[in-house]
C-alpha cells in the first residue's frame, strides 16, 4: 500500500472538548466555587436599594450629587480614618466604574455588590488592617462598616445591609474560605489564625456568618482553638459579657393597647422568677450568695476571711507551697466577698436612679416596655459578670413601690378624714359654748 493512501486515513478529527489535564485552573478550583461563579447575582430589592441609598447619602458630594475626590476625603476624615491623598485617589479610581472621575449611585451599588471586592474586603490578602495598597477597592466596604458600627444609619437600613451581606457570604459556600486555593487558584494559601483579631471590620461580620454555616466537626475545632487561646484567668476582663447578638427588631413596635395591660399583668404574676435565659447563660444567683455572707468580725473590723489570712501569716514566718494554696483559697473568698458587697451597693444606687428618673412611667407613656431591657443592660457589673437588675427585678420593684404608695395614700386619706371630723366636732363645741355664754 502506498504512503499517499495511508495519510488520509490517519487524519485526526478536531477536538470538541478540552482535556482535563489541560484545564489546570478548573481542576484546582473547588467544585462549590465553580458553581458559584456561574451563579448570577440577584437584583437588589426595593428595601435594599433604600438602605444603600441611606449609606450613599452619608457621603459628602458635589453639586451634581456625586462623590468626588474632595467629598471622599471629607467623609474619610469625618469617620476618623487616616489615609493619604494618594490612597484616596486610587480608591476613587477603583470605584469609578463609568470612568467619569466621580462615583455616582450606580457606581456605588456596583462596587458594594461585586463578589470579588466583597471577598477581598472580608478575607484580605494582607494581614495589616486597612491595607489599601495591598487590597485596592475596599475603602467603600470599610466606610460602610464604620457606618454600621457607629449606628450612623437608620435602624431599618442597618438590618437590611447586614442581612444582605450575611446572605451573600453564606452563598459563597463554606469551602470558599476554608479551601487552600481560595481567591488565588493555587497561588495563595490561607492560614486562618483564630487567636488574631479580624484584619478588617467587614471580616468581623463575615466571621459571625461563617459560624452559622460551619459543619459540626469544624465547629468543635473552632471551640477547642478558642479555649486554647483563652486560658483561664481570674480577671473580670477575661470573661465574655452576655449581650444580644442581633438587635431587637421589635424594639420600635408599639406596645399592646391599654385594655390588654391587665391581662399582661396577670401573665407577669404567674411568670416564674427564674427565666430560661438564666439557665442557658448559667447566670448565678449572686444576691442569695451575697445574703449568705458572714458579717464582719466586730473585734477586728474585717471579714472572717481576711482575719484568717492575717492569722495564718502571723503564725508562720515562711510559707510552703501547701500554705500558699490555702492562703490563695482564702484570698479568693475574700475577693468574692468584696465584689459581692460592691455589687450590692451599686444595685441600691441603680434602684435609686430608676426611681429618680421614674423608669416605670417611661414605658407607660410610650406603651413600649423595652426600656426595662435597656436599663437592665445599663446595670451590667464586672463584679458579678452579669446585670445587677434584670427586667423582672425592675418590674417587681415597681409593683412594690406602687403598692406601698397606694397604701400610704389610703392611710393618709383616712387620717385626713378623721382629722376633718375632729375639727368639725371642735367647731360645734365652740359654737355651743358661745351660745351658752351669750
Swiss-Prot record:
Range of residues in the leader sequence: none
UniProt keyword annotations, A-Z: Calcium, Metal-binding, Phosphoprotein, Repeat
GO molecular function terms listed in the Swiss-Prot or TrEMBL record: calcium ion binding
Region (Disordered): 405-438
Coiled-coil region list: none
TM region(s), chain numbering: none
Domain (EF-hand) ranges: 47-82, 83-118
Biased composition (Low complexity): 405-415
Chain intervals with Basic residues compositional bias: 426-438
Pfam families xref list: EF-hand_8
Top-level taxon of the source organism: Eukaryota
Modified residues annotated as Phosphotyrosine in this record: 279
Binding site for Ca(2+): 96, 98, 100, 102, 107
Protein name: EF-hand calcium-binding domain-containing protein 3
Annotated organism of origin: Homo sapiens (Human)
Gene: EFCAB3
